[in-house]
Design a protein with these regions (language model features):
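Sequence signature of WD/YWTD-type beta-propeller architectures
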Residues: 1-212
Length: 212
């Protein structure tokens, strides 16, 4: 078993993905591309062979500032890194989650610079067949695929407050699972084979990790 996490432990401003054994041994950087300046949300594929993540990239930039965010996939040995959202104009990309069969990624993003509210999208891992599931500009975030592969849970402000919602994988049958004055967000399905770790007190060094 191994843990993937994000850190800037080398002293630079950019973050990298690191992998280590669950014992803490065999620590090594997985990403080392100077164009990837801020990496977040590493997520193991169901078969443990790949990791999807979000990164800000030095380049043309959707915001005209020389930087843009995208979704990347990398092999667990650090090879074959590729951006699967490079052909889209989406911004504020976040929270990628694998489908149960490992063939698709669900994520949240904004369709245009300055547009209020993220929407939920799904894309094949080869970067093809991008489709939008929510179309309501209600600030939808943190999508997670169900282990059955039939539903997606996410947080949404469609009722004026962040609640946990669920929908079918085609975007139909959206309904609230929570209804509370306090905001509810960042849902997660419990999968016995996978454990997420987020030590907030060490945010500057390790802000997200996952055991596989």
């Amino acid at each position: 078993k191994q843990i993937a996490f994000v850190s800037n432990r080398d002293g630079g401003k950019a973050t990298k993905i690191y992998v280590m054994d669950t014992s803490g041994n065999n620590l090594r950087p997985l990403t080392n591309d100077a164009k990837l300046i801020w990496i977040t949300s590493p997520n193991w594929s169901p078969d443990g062979k790949q990791i999807v993540f979000v990164s800000w990239v030095i380049g043309k930039g959707a915001k005209g500032n020389g930087k843009s965010s995208g979704i990347f996939i990398i092999n667990r040995d650090g090879k074959n890194i590729r951006e699967i959202t490079k052909d889209s104009k989406l911004t504020s990309v976040e929270s990628p989650s694998w489908s149960a069969d490992g063939k698709q990624i669900v994520f949240a993003a904004s369709a245009a610079v300055g547009k209020n509210g993220n929407e939920i999208y799904v894309i094949d891992i080869n970067g093809k067949n991008l489709r939008q599931l929510t179309k309501d500009a209600n600030d939808n975030h943190h999508p997670v695929w169900s282990p059955s592969g039939r539903q997606i849970i996410f947080s949404s402000r469609r009722t004026g407050n962040y609640e946990i919602c669920v929908m079918d994988i085609n975007g139909a049958n959206i309904r609230n699972l929570t209804n509370h004055p306090a905001p509810d967000y960042q849902p997660s399905y419990f999968v016995p084979s996978l454990l997420s770790v987020s030590p907030v007190e060490n945010f500057k060094l390790t802000n997200w990790a996952e055991i596989k």
